Amino acid sequence: MDPNTEGTTTKKYTSQRRTIDISASYDRLYFLKKHGQENSSYIEAETSYNAHILPPDAYGFHGHAINTATKFTHLSSNKVKHVIPALTWTPEGRRLVVATYNGEFSLWSGSSFNFESIMQAHDSAVTVMTYSHTGDWMVSGSADGELKIWQPNFNMVKVMDQAHMECVREISFSPTDQKFVSCSDDNVLKIWNFSNGQQERVLSGHHWDVKSCDWHPKMGLIVSGSKDNLIKFWDPRSGSCVSTMLGFKHTIISTKFQPKQGNLLSVISKDKTCKVYDIRQQAKELFSVRDDVDYMTLQWHPIDETVFTVGCYDGSIKHFDLSQENQPNKPTHNIPYAHEKCVTSLAYSPIGHIMASASKDRTIRFWTRSRAVDPNAFDDPTYNNEKVNAWYFGINNNINAVRNKTEHGVALPPSEDSNNNENGDGSRSVEPERPSVSTLPGLGSGLPGLSF
């Protein structure tokens, strides 16, 4: 030990870490119910009203703006980084399961976003993971056509080798969880008996890779999308195709029913279009939008069933609201620089207060509902693209941080005093103003013994 440093202690620096606690919202809801008060469908534009934010399901039809996940909260990544093709939340919403191209499962906390565990799940890339409706089982598929069934504690109970000849693209459970359907690049869909793991039917009809499939949440109806630009509806009892839809000029990327009612079907394609159909009216087209970039992944909001989110090839994330009347074919919210590369997967927490996104930039990013008044809401690098090394560690690490606004921000323009507070490198540092003691009533000369 150096005698010159003997007796000295190393100074430790602390930083704030964002944590999401949904229990406070449920406590507030319980208080309102107990005292017979009505839920407010809006939040006052005042920071003190942040404590009044309720759970997403408490707002009903009027909570679209409140429940939209627009605020970047945390960035997570494994030590050994790989592309992340699939995400899913555990049924209770406490953890996020992340699948990687090297066949691993990793678990992340859904509140503090800490890393919890990692395991080797498949010998090749894990391409899809799906929980049953009851949450008692999970099925995963890999790039070598293998399917595996897991318990909630990630104890593997069954392996189905060569379930498909090519990469498994999608898995979806029936409403009763007694069966599930899988699709693959081998041009077919297969229906499996969950209790014994045996194949029941093969749904043939597509002429190219089947990229997506989904089982209706209430009915015996399966939808699939393929590289042959076709959307097909199937009867799982007979295994026959009941209808074929045209209308796209390129590969169908994703087809998803509404998670609860199932009345609407959303479809995205590589022809840069997104469409929503009403299956109650012979698949009438209700919504259509065309973009300048490819849509890569799609996810419905679990609570607000008129809201869905798409991830794009350029790394942006866009929220759409079908109940919007002013501009029905425009996104209600756009996060232009959500990721540095193509977005590969989106997953909402079952409660609906957090959204996780994955990308080919090998990171997982968590997004939460915005607050009533947030001066830095649209001044994050995910909105203005002012990213430097480790930019995500510097976002609001100090709970009292006040950062200079850009033209992308929504705060008031800086005052004249802050304009004169420039650093040598041309940047400006803004410090919060402290009220003078002389402004307090009865304290004209300040407090004795204290200097400000």
From Swiss-Prot:
InterPro entries xrefs: G-protein_beta_WD-40_rep, Pfs2-like, WD40/YVTN_repeat-like_dom_sf, WD40_repeat_dom_sf, WD40_rpt
Subcellular location, record wording: Nucleus
Main location: nucleus
Residue span of region Disordered: 409-452
UniProt-listed GO biological process terms: chromosome segregation; mRNA 3'-end processing
GO CC annotations, alphabetized: mRNA cleavage and polyadenylation specificity factor complex
Amino acid composition bias (Polar residues), ranges on this chain: 416-426
Membrane-spanning segments: none
Biased composition (Gly residues): 443-452
PROSITE patterns listed in its UniProt record: WD_REPEATS_2, WD_REPEATS_REGION
Sequence ranges of the WD repeats: 79-118, 121-160, 163-202, 205-244, 247-287, 290-330, 338-377
Keywords: Chromosome partition, mRNA processing, Nucleus, Repeat, WD repeat
Function comment: Required for 3'-end cleavage and polyadenylation of pre-mRNAs. Also involved in chromosome segregation where it has a role in chromosome attachment to the mitotic spindle.
Protein name per UniProt: Polyadenylation factor subunit 2
Organism field: Kluyveromyces lactis (strain ATCC 8585 / CBS 2359 / DSM 70799 / NBRC 1267 / NRRL Y-1140 / WM37) (Yeast)
Taxon lineage: Eukaryota, Fungi, Dikarya, Ascomycota, Saccharomycotina
Gene: PFS2
